[in-house]
Amino acid sequence: MHSEAEESKEVATDVFNSKNLAVQAQKKILGKMVSKSIATTLIDDTSSEVLDELYRVTREYTQNKKEAEKIIKNLIKTVIKLAILYRNNQFNQDELALMEKFKKKVHQLAMTVVSFHQVDYTFDRNVLSRLLNECREMLHQIIQRHLTAKSHGRVNNVFDHFSDCEFLAALYNPFGNFKPHLQKLCDGINKMLDEENI
């Protein structure tokens, strides 16, 4: 028999927090010299809410807590590494030009995600999947000189999941279980668009 303390501990450890994860990833990447403030500036509250919702929908879809955590951890690590490279002027001119194209493509993706949610009967999983895979290819090119094969594997892990047409169809099913998640995701993405953070 479990005591109340043990049960509350189990519930507490079941909570996923992308903000804390971002701080952990930042510390691992840059070692002891880096403060928490860098990670918190890279992953703001709105981004954190979107990441938490992505975790919840991924966990519910995969029915696998470890897999969902791995996908979101890989997403956070990729975002942080990319931001560190960018902020420390590690990209050459070609990579910077590609980075600008990547930012525009991510913005287009965000607008499409929200539009497909807001306008009935416009959702096309192939369009979203294609946009996600275009982002993946650009990202691989941007980080090619800078990050390891393991990092490229993380990128693939993230995009393999989110660009999967079956996942996208489940997420956008107007009668499905994911409708509340999609609403929260789009609310967060809309806020990021308004704040020009995406």
From Swiss-Prot:
Keywords: Apoptosis, Coiled coil, Cytoplasm
GO molecular function: cysteine-type endopeptidase inhibitor activity involved in apoptotic process
One Pfam family it belongs to: DUF758
A cellular-component GO term for this protein: nucleoplasm
Keyword Endoplasmic reticulum: no
Location in or out of the cell: Cytoplasm
Record's note on what induces expression: By nuclear factor-KB (NF-KB) and TNF. Induction by TNF depends upon activation of NF-KB.
Keyword set includes Transmembrane: no
Tissue occurrence: Expressed at high levels in the spleen, lymph node, thymus, thyroid, bone marrow and placenta. Expressed at high levels both in various tumor tissues, unstimulated and cytokine-activated cultured cells. Expressed at low levels in the spinal cord, ovary, lung, adrenal glands, heart, brain, testis and skeletal muscle.
Coiled coil feature spans: 49-83
Major location category of this protein: cytoplasm
Entry's family note: Belongs to the TNFAIP8 family.
Functional note: Acts as a negative mediator of apoptosis and may play a role in tumor progression. Suppresses the TNF-mediated apoptosis by inhibiting caspase-8 activity but not the processing of procaspase-8, subsequently resulting in inhibition of BID cleavage and caspase-3 activation.
Protein name: Tumor necrosis factor alpha-induced protein 8
Originating species: Homo sapiens
